[in-house]
Every structure is written in C-alpha cells, then in structure tokens.
C-alpha cells in the first residue's frame, strides 16, 4: 500500500473544520442569542397556533397547568429551539458559500466566480427551506397527530383519564416538530460534508450500520424520549441519508 492513499476520514480537513468552528464561535453564539431574542416574543403566538392546530389535542384530552412558570418555561424552550435553528442555518450558509476553501486553505481552485457562489448559495438556501417545509408537513400531518392519538387511545384502553400537563404536552409537540425540520436537512448536510471533503463517501458506505444507529440515536436526542418517537424521527433520517448518497453518485 502506498503512502499517498487517501484517508477515509481526511484528518487535515477535519482539523481545519475544528479551527473554523472556533473562529466562528462568536458569530454562532451571536446567532443563538438573536434566535432567543426573536423567538421569545413570538413564542406566545406559536403556543396559540399549536393549541388550535387540528389533531394536536385529541377530543378526550384535558390540558392543565400545574405550576405558574409553565408558560414562561415553554416560551424559553421554543426560543432556544429557534436559536439552535439559526445556528445550524448559519453553518449551512457559511459552508455552502466558502466551500472547500473554508476547510482546506491550501486549495487554490475554490475561489470561483462571485456569480457561481451566489448560485450555489441560492440552491442551498432553497433546498434547506424546501426540506424544512417537507419536514414540517411530515410532523404536522403524520408524526404528531398519529403519536398523540396513539398515546391518548392507549391510556383510554386501560381506563385512564387523559389529563395532560400543558408543559409536557407542548414540549412533546414542539420537540417533534423541531426534530422533524432538523432531521429533514440530512441530505443537504451530508452532500455539503461530502463535497467539501470533510468526510469521504467510503467512510459513509463502510460505516453504514454505525451511521444508521447514530441516526436513530440522534432521533432519540432530538425527539421526546420514547421508542416510537425515536423511530419516527430517526427512520426518515436513515432514508434521507441513502437518498443523499444516491444524489451524490448521480451528480458526480
């Protein structure tokens, strides 16, 4: 085996990525704080929308508030999720704009034309928004109504009265909604990582089982802590990962 064989995980690019994240830390923290600032005032309207949404509250379920701080904590949670969303959007935009130049400063061929960068950024933005909308539709029409209806019927089947705490219910719903929007960004994130050389296609294909497990684990982290939610969030991530690999193969 010769020494020029490319590493499955390019360590030089990975180290440069870590350096890039450190340099962007101030910007990312700023975007998170901006998300908190924007998210908290509008979180009241978001809560009202969820309360009125079809299928989010089964007919035989009663909502209660146990502690006076529940609404404030809910608004902070929603604002935090918006802040995290802005941080991820910033990373995607920066990575798509700078490309390999961001990761490998020795690359001289990534300067490109300004118009090319604009086109690439526009494509990434439209793709990200489109994937987010698809994720939101999946959560709104399939994931949330199906799960809540299942949980309500399961409790009724054993003779229990469905009385849900506002914070627990809405935290569950917003967690699923946020997880769906983020998880549907998987194809875009994988393609950006492949095209910038941070990871190689060999790494993804050779470690497919581990990545599938990681996707399900990430689904458990992003979604409420129950097995059904984990598979309903992590499952689409696995499918979207395979779609992104197919797109990468076709577009090369």
Task: State the predicted function of each range.
Residues 1-252:
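Membrane topogenic/interface segments and analogous intrinsically disordered interaction regions
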């Amino acid at each position: 085996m010769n020494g020029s064989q490319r590493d499955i995980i390019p360590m030089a690019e990975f180290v440069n990525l870590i350096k890039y994240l450190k340099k962007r830390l101030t910007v990312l923290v700023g975007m998170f704080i901006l998300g908190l600032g924007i998210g908290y005032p509008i979180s009241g309207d978001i809560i009202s929308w969820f309360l009125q949404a079809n299928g989010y509250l089964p007919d035989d379920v009663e909502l209660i508030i146990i502690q006076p701080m529940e609404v404030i904590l809910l608004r902070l949670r929603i604002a935090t999720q918006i802040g995290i969303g802005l941080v991820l959007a910033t990373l995607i935009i920066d990575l798509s704009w700078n490309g390999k130049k961001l990761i490998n400063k020795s690359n001289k061929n990534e300067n490109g034309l300004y118009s090319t960068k604009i086109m690439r950024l526009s494509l990434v933005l439209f793709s990200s928004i489109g994937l987010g909308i698809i994720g939101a539709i999946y959560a709104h029409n399939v994931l949330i109504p199906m799960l809540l209806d299942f949980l309500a019927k399961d409790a009724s089947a054993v003779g229990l009265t469905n009385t849900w705490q506002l914070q627990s219910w809405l935290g569950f719903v917003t967690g699923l909604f946020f997880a769906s929007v983020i998880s549907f960004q998987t194809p875009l994130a994988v393609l950006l990582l492949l095209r910038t050389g941070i990871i190689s296609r060999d790494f993804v294909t050779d470690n497919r089982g581990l990545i599938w497990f990681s996707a399900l684990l990430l689904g458990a982290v992003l979604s409420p802590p129950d097995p059904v939610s984990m598979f309903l969030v992590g499952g689409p991530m696995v499918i979207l990962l395979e779609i992104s690999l197919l797109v990468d193969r076709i577009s090369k």
